[in-house]
């Protein structure tokens, strides 16, 4: 329990279940990662289609090296997956609860409708 200097009538048992500061670090990393609008845009596109770097760079109006840099960060965070087909590498949003939650949050916050809905 955390002794509070002022008693405002809150249920103290709730504080007993409060996560430790380090428990929020992983969550904070996702928010930091998505603090870049280019990464949010790339992630959103990949939630709806599978693409190569060349096509993605045209779609998001960025250079291929810049898109590759952002993809590497998204992939390292587990938000994007890739597969190789011959010489081409295709990227898509990861099929994970976190990726789906972030996709839904982006669309809800921006009132964006998914293609095909």
What is the role of each PLM region?
Residues 21-65, 89-96:
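N-terminal helix-turn-helix DNA-binding core of bacterial DNA-binding proteins
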Residues 6, 69-70, 97, 108:
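Histidine-centered active-site/metal-ligand motif
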Residues 58, 69, 75-76:
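Alpha-helical residues within the helix-turn-helix
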Residues 1-34:
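N-terminal leader segment of winged-helix/HTH proteins
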Residues 90-117:
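Conserved segment of winged-helix/HTH DNA-binding domains
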Residues 75-85, 92:
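Beta-hairpin "wing" of winged helix-turn-helix
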């Amino acid at each position: 329990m955390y002794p509070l200097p002022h008693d405002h009538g809150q249920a103290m048992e709730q504080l007993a279940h409060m996560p430790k500061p380090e428990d929020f670090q992983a969550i904070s990393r996702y928010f930091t990662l998505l603090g870049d609008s280019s990464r949010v845009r790339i992630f959103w596109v990949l939630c709806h289609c599978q693409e190569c770097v060349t096509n993605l760079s045209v779609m998001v109006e960025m250079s291929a090296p810049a898109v590759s840099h952002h993809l590497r960060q998204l992939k390292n965070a587990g938000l994007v997956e890739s597969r190789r087909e011959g010489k081409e590498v295709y990227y898509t949003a990861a099929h994970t609860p976190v990726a789906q939650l972030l996709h839904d949050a982006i669309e809800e916050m921006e009132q964006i409708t998914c293609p095909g809905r």
